[in-house]
Amino acid sequence: MIFDWGGTLTPWHTIDYAQMWRLVCEPHYPGNHEDRADAALAAENVLWEQARTEHRSASIFGVLERAGIEPTDALIASYLREWEPHTFTDPEGIAVLRQLRQREIKIGVLSNTMWPRSWHEDVFRRDGVLDLIDGAVYSSEIDWTKPHPRAFLAAMAAVGADNPERCVFVGDRPWDDIFGAKSVGMRAVLLPNSDVPTFADAQPDAVIGSLSELLPLIESW
């Protein structure tokens, strides 16, 4: 069982990225923090568009370099502090991960992310679930983003799986998650949210309204 992270293991939040960057930059660039924030947002948008259209990965440090912002420890601390409210693992997700572990089902994570592995592991450790995850792939560490098939194959390898037909992917994005997983032969479960665009060619094997519905679903398979 392989999960997306943002919007799946974490509840979906609508975020004002422009305001977030202003809050990050304000303590470190007095007098011109808005210009720095605008540059960071523009750089971030360019690299996310690259991920969407070319399936090429990027990192938060690439964003900062492109924006001309030095990644000091203090600035990174401000960035993580602003993001923290949006990173907490869904309590229903924690329960599902524990139930999967009890059933000896391998658990993986595959996330399109600009964050390094250590930041994600800090989040999972804080929420008490790091030891429940058998393997994880973060696009910041590889050349591709979802829905590129190699991203999904890398996630399978991370949990020691070699047969996609025995893997289930759970995600909130029809294009990145569902289409991508189905393209390599996985089953795919959609946990939709209203802010993510639909994609007609993405045909999930099931749609759930919450993670609490996942265990009864896979047991019916």
For each feature predicted by the language model, list its residue ranges.
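Asp-based, Mg2+/Mn2+-dependent phosphohydrolase catalytic module
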Residues: 1-3, 34, 94, 98-101, ...
